Amino acid sequence: LPFTIRAYFYGGSGEIKIVHSLVFDGDQNKYFIRSLGIRFDVPMREALYNRHVAFSCSDGGVWSEPVQPLIGRRILTLDGYGPLQKMQMSGERIPDYEKFDAKNRSLLDNWASWDSYRLSQLNADAFTIRKRTNGNNPWIGTFSGTRSNGYAFVGDVTGGLSVGYKDFWQSYPSSIEITNANSDKASLT
């Protein structure tokens, strides 16, 4: 499909505005465009528990979660540090894996990590956020609301990428998906 992309760069700003258009010159009765998206690859340099994702919710709220939440039936501990889960949820760096003793490393080795996340605005009054551990497992619902502003972030404690989709909820059905969050290169589409 022929398409045009315009990118706007502003001095002193880290923001890039992208406007795209495509020309569909096919037979609408014979061909159908199933989806259209722009994919960004994001390097993930930190341990799974130091990686984070976030989506905007209704009324300016934000849903966020670490790729590997430090929560389970046992509490992860490290001498000289306070509550590690609280640090993690605040976006602070959790110490390197090697600093933990064997018992705590076992917890880190066995706690779930989430690979994919999806924000979907399926109608004017409902969005969902779902996640899964890998492509072979089903999506599970984590949060729902009315109208998302269409913002997403994926990255680690050293940085990442955020995108905003203008008029997201008004453009339903729309979705923003993060995949490969537990690999060296996450994708945001």
State what each model feature region is.
Residues 1-189:
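Beta-strand/loop-rich accessory regions of lumenal/periplasmic or secreted enzymes
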